[in-house]
Amino acid sequence: MKLLSVLALSATASSVLGASIPVDTRAEKFLIELAPGETRWVTEEEKWALKESGQDFFDITDEEVGFTAAVAQPAVAYPTSIRHADAVNAMIATLSKENMQRDLTKLSSFHNRYYKSDYGKQSATWLQQQVQAAITASGANRYGAKVASFQHNFAQHSIIATIPGRSAEIVVVGAHQDSINGRSPMTGRAPGADDNGSGSVTILEALRGVLQDQTIVQGKAANTIEFHWYAGEEAGLLGSQAIFANYKQTGKKVKGMLNQDMTGYVKGMLDKGLKESFGIITDNVNANLTKFIRMVITKYCQIPTIDTRCGYACSDHASANRNGFPSAMVAESPIDLLDPHLHTDSDNISYLSFDHMIQHAKLVVGFVTELAK
């Protein structure tokens, strides 16, 4: 139970008993994990201060009593060769930078997408409508494809699109949908174009591409496919933690999860004299899944890779990993060259490359198809 709930009960009792019981007016506190086994109780303001200092964390306040984080990498076999090049290339040919620019213009127009705000709720509702439209336009809904809200104890909901396959084993692609202004989290302007509007519209356009394949649309792929848009990532990976904890509790099988968090900024690399590249995260990920992703990139994308590390609890793939599911992350660049405008009111479309975002969309289409079909 959160301290806030305790305070609410105390306040009720105080009014009933004529204020004979003192009310604790201390700020609500949250239990965070900064490294395996390293926990701390902090206020909301202290959470944001840690975030702005570059310290990521899991918010585990609502974690089930007795939860044990996974410590071993799941033993999962992945394809060692490309098997669906014709199908993937046909899907890739349908990907549209114009769609991505249109969607990101709208998504970044909300005042912010803060997980506790009405704006965060409104943006999630709009995004879910776009996902539903893509499913309906493809006809996949006639074969069981659907999109659903995953509700939390805050305003913004997560979104899960499901395309059934012949087995219940799931291939997941995810991106967080929320945004934050580091100086004024509650009310500040936070367009979040790159962090993480870019990842959100990247996987949305990849979903449209995947839904061009009739084998997948008609539920004939070997595995089930899910696209996730997570709420509350900035506050401690809240949405993805809740989803993957639920999957663990209900015995779901996840073959692999690919996270897309920030997919549009290349200037940092170019200013350093580097080639435009993907940033392949190598820590807190599944090594075999990452090896498979490298193969997909080599086949379907036109830019190279650079290995990089992002630390503990840096993004939503860490939630999958913590719950025992194999996960990986590919970022827009090495972590030290990410978009410097993140968490500010200047995180705008004008700094982004839609050519680079298309490369990420190609990766997602290739990943999903080669692993699920």
Curated annotation (Swiss-Prot):
- Keywords, comma-separated and alphabetical: Aminopeptidase, Disulfide bond, Glycoprotein, Hydrolase, Metal-binding, Protease, Secreted, Signal, Zinc, Zymogen
Q: Which InterPro entries match?
A: M28_fam, Peptidase_M28
Q: Which GO terms describe its cellular component?
A: extracellular region
Residues of this chain annotated as glycosylated in UniProt: N196, N288, N348
One GO process term, biological-process aspect: proteolysis
Could you say which residues bind Zn(2+) 2 here?
D195, E234, H343
Subcellular location field: Secreted
E.C. no: 3.4.11.-
Which GO MF term does the entry hold, naming one?
Answer: metal ion binding
Q: How is the cofactor bound?
A: Binds 2 Zn(2+) ions per subunit.
Keyword Ribonucleoprotein attached: no
Which parts of the sequence bind Zn(2+) 1?
A: H176, D195, D261
Q: Which cofactor does it need?
A: Zn(2+)
Q: Which cysteines are joined by disulfide bonds?
A: C310-C314
Name of a matching Pfam family: Peptidase_M28
Q: Which Gene3D superfamilies did the record assign? A: Zn peptidases
Q: Which residues form the signal peptide?
A: 1-18
User: Principal place where this protein is found?
Assistant: secreted
Which residues are processed away as propeptide to yield the mature protein?
19-75
* Top EC class for this record: hydrolase
- Where along the sequence do coiled-coil regions lie? none
Question: How is this protein organized at the quaternary level?
Answer: Monomer.
Q: What does this protein do?
A: Extracellular aminopeptidase that allows assimilation of proteinaceous substrates.
- Which protein is depicted? Leucine aminopeptidase 1
What is the protein's species of origin?
Arthroderma gypseum (strain ATCC MYA-4604 / CBS 118893)
- Gene behind this chain? LAP1
